[in-house]
């Protein structure tokens, strides 16, 4: 009995260790499939073309601001831009190599000359001043020191005033990248000192095509209607489409179907909607009431 208990404990421990390794190695789809180069960005052709053109011509302003609804690629584009600016290997400035120390350190979050700040949690003037105190110092190992402030609209009025002084006369070695979902809350004095890029909500077809690519690569089974439904529910956000897909994948048994998506989201089925429309067109009030009661 003692030996069997010991083996059982060993088995349980190995099972837990295996489970922990799986949890550590698994990446959610939105993170795993986040674009790492401009060519991987979907649905923002105008912005990508403008950024690549500025990089290739080596005509870079000292401040950029990316605006748009959630999940459209603001922070992702800012990170790609940061890699392109400081890449040491790429023959073409608009194509970060993803192999040099600068590119790799930005991707893994260890870059010294690239700071990413969540302005929503560090919105106070003292925190902003602390950040700006490092601006005059030259970069350690890269051509530029790059500051990415996400959700910049959350900064306090005092913080914006402090930032404005630096934006008026930025050092040659500094580039600011800002991202916001509410550009109307950013003071005009700050906006006027930035090159602005408004990212549009992604089209359903773009989201659908990207989902199809990802599902095929991930060996996820699906039907065509489920892709259309997921893409429509995402409301222009690729990240939301992938987050929703994760939920449906865990809910589905082997294959994502339109019916599974509707059940998970509490939506009326396509068949029910078609029946209701037919009843309305045919002026069949009795049938319409029956269908309404069934759905309720």
Language-model features and meaning:
Residues 1, 41, 54, 279-282:
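Hydrophobic side-chain positions on well-ordered alpha-helices
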Residues 1-14, 294-295:
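Single conserved hydrophobic/aromatic residue that forms the stacking wall/gate
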Residues 4, 120-121, 237:
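Short linear Ser/Thr-Pro motifs
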Residues 4-8, 187, 266:
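A short glycine-leucine-enriched loop at secondary-structure breakpoints
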Residues 15-196, 206:
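P-loop/Walker A NTP-binding region and its immediately flanking N-terminal helices
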Residues 108-112, 127-130, 143, 179, ...:
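Extended, largely alpha-helical regulatory/partner-binding modules appended to the mid-to-C-terminal parts
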